[in-house]
Amino acid sequence: MKVLLLNGGPHPQGCVATALEEVSSVLKVEGIDSEIVWIGNQPVAGCIGCGLCRKEGQCFRQDGVNAFIEKAKECDGFIFGSPVHYGSASGAITSFLDRVFYSGSVHFRGKPGACVVSCRRGGNTAAFDQLNKYFTINQMPVVSSQYWNQVHGTSRIEVLQDK
């Protein structure tokens, strides 16, 4: 079994990376392979609604979207992580996932998904809801928890202290 984790945060050792590394370590203990793909460090163009992905099965833009879809074909589940920017998921992960799901939704259907959001204080539930909609519109079971999957802090250290 393999789970693909997507980091939409801009910092390589930031709050989202810390949260996803924690998830990855728990998966490893459970005997589940995982891979973290980081997209927050590069510009991600939004979907322009051209429809070529419906015909070609991939986005015409040659960036990480098509490579992520290829990885998704071999994975059994997904976890998307994003910082909260103005009460929403990051622009990078939103643009990325819009194009991923327009281009390759068939490779996600029926596979479980979860998300984790990182914020200093507020906006987390709106961003959490936004990311979960990618799962629900695509017939993916949403992995639930006893509380919303969120971390609070402005640094790696603060996230690790967030109990």
Region roles according to the model:
Residues 60-144:
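Helix-loop-strand module that forms the ligand-binding subsite of alpha/beta enzymes
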Residues 1, 29-30, 67, 141-163:
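Glycine-rich phosphate/pyrophosphate-binding loop and the adjoining helix
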Residues 33-35, 58, 141:
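Conserved beta-strand segments of alpha/beta enzyme cores
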Residues 32-42:
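A short beta-strand-loop structural module common to alpha/beta enzyme folds
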